[in-house]
Structures are given as structure tokens and as C-alpha cells.
UniProtKB/Swiss-Prot annotation:
Taxonomic path: Bacteria, Pseudomonadati, Chlorobiota, Chlorobiia, Chlorobiales
Catalytic activity: (2R)-2-phosphoglycerate = (2R)-3-phosphoglycerate
This protein's name: 2,3-bisphosphoglycerate-dependent phosphoglycerate mutase
Active site, UniProt feature: 9, 87
PROSITE patterns: PG_MUTASE
Pathway: Carbohydrate degradation; glycolysis; pyruvate from D-glyceraldehyde 3-phosphate: step 3/5
GO BP terms in the entry: gluconeogenesis; glycolytic process
């Protein structure tokens, strides 16, 4: 049986402040670092190990991976960083407080922007200081690849190439894979793996710092999936994510 482990980064400073983060490169809080280390312990207690890891080019995910691998004594394994695993780009919402945005635009509209499949938030202007096209880490991307805003559909479309061309072949070789990424890039992968409908994906929330294990068959089709840790605490963490945009 194949086991794939997914992990959303630990709590970031903007998670704590309940702000739309997107591609902004904010770091973990002290609690987020603890979450990352605890994730490593949960993985270790489950008897899981890895041959290779994948993460984004954003420090909250990279540092989460470092902390987890440190606990696992696996800091030596290859790590592939890719912009394709970045959080979805929240466009002009990036940096705004979610509750304040809900009070301004209404909870229903903000839920559509946060969780719908094909409705992106308002776009950034290219002269906005938040535009990622001036960031060195994206220097090799074509202008069309640099988002001004993204819906989940856009995130799926940029994530799947690295899954199909890079990660999936490694799994088929028998390598044990860990993916540390973000709420929406992981939602994109979960939607693909579980074949979740565009309507049902609205209700999927992934908490910070809790390992999600997928057991896959030889065709990489899910047999089952489950979070590692105290199930009641995990349920509360999922509910907390769902309630972030309440006015």
C-alpha cells in the first residue's frame, strides 16, 4: 500500500491576524513552529518515513517542512521547492482582514471568494507593490504565469503539472513522499485525488500543522484518508478554519 502525507504549514503571523495571505511571504508564529514540530512527532509516532519532500517557495511552508524533518531526523532527504505549490493568490484581498472584509462585502460574497471553485477575488494591478512579478523567486516565470488573482480552479491548473510530471512518477517508483504546502494548494490536490465536485469543494477546510495521510492503491487512487492526532482536536481545528471569515 502507498502512503502519501500532506501537511499544511503551521500557523503564520497572518493566520493569527486572520488576514488573506496568498503569495505574501509571511513567517510562522512561535505556535506555528510548535505545530510543525508536533506534526513531525505525529508522523514519527505513526511509523512513517520519507524519501523526498515537496514544498512551495514561501517560508511558512519551507520552515514547517524543516521543523518536521528535523523531528524525523530526515533533514538530509531531497527537497523540491516549486511556485506551483504556493498558496492561491488572493489578488486585491491579500493582506486584508477576513472578518473586516466580510463586514464590508458580506459573508456570502467572501465565502464565494474564499471557497468557490471558479470565482477569483478582485485582481491586483501590476503596479501594486503586492504584485509578485517583481520578486526574484519568480524571475523565470512568464508574465502569463504570474497571477493577479486566483480561484481554486486556477490553483488546480497550476498544481496538477507538478503532480503529474514530477511527484506522481516518484511515487510510482516506490519513493515515500511528503508534501508541505498551503490550505488551497492542498485543497486543489485533495479535490483531484478524491474527485470532489465543484459544489462540494466549498465545504473542504484543511487545518494548519496536522498531517493528512492518504492510502493509495497501485493506480494512485485513494483507499482512505485520515488526519494524524487527536480527532476531537482536529475537528475543532477544521471548524476554526471554516469560521475565519465570519463578520
Amino acid at each position: 500500500m502507498i502512503k502519501l502525507v500532506l501537511l499544511r504549514h503551521g500557523e503564520s503571523q497572518w493566520n493569527l491576524e486572520n488576514r488573506f495571505t496568498g503569495w505574501h511571504d509571511i513567517d510562522l508564529t512561535d505556535n506555528g513552529r510548535i505545530e510543525a514540530s508536533n506534526a513531525g512527532r505525529a508522523i514519527k509516532e505513526a511509523g512513517l518515513t520519507f524519501d523526498i519532500a515537496y514544498t512551495s517557495v514561501l517560508k511558512r511552508a519551507i520552515r514547517t517542512l524543516w521543523n518536521a524533518l528535523d523531528v524525523l531526523d530526515l533533514m538530509w532527504i531531497p527537497v523540491v521547492k516549486s511556485w506551483r505549490l504556493n498558496e492561491r493568490h488572493y489578488g486585491a484581498l491579500q493582506g486584508l482582514n477576513k472578518s473586516e472584509t466580510s463586514r464590508k462585502y458580506g459573508e456570502e460574497q467572501v465565502l464565494v471568494w474564499r471557497r468557490s471553485y471558479d470565482t477569483p477575488p478582485p485582481v491586483l494591478d501590476k503596479d501594486d507593490e503586492r504584485y509578485p512579478g517583481t520578486d526574484r523567486r519568480y524571475a523565470e516565470l512568464g508574465e502569463a504565469e504570474i497571477p493577479l488573482s486566483e480561484c481554486l480552479k486556477d490553483t488546480v491548473e497550476r498544481f496538477l503539472p507538478i503532480w503529474r510530471d514530477t511527484i506522481e512518477p516518484e511515487i510510482r517508483k516506490g519513493r515515500k513522499v511528503l508534501i508541505v504546502a498551503h490550505g488551497n494548494s492542498l485543497r486543489a490536490l485533495v479535490k483531484y485525488l478524491d474527485n470532489i465536485s465543484e459544489e462540494d469543494i466549498v465545504g473542504l477546510n484543511i487545518p494548519t500543522g496536522i498531517p493528512l495521510v492518504y492510502e493509495l492503491d497501485d493506480d494512485l487512487k485513494p483507499l482512505k484518508s485520515y488526519y494524524l492526532g487527536d480527532q476531537e482536536a482536529i475537528k475543532q481545528a477544521v471548524q476554526a478554519v471554516a469560521g475565519q471569515a465570519k463578520a
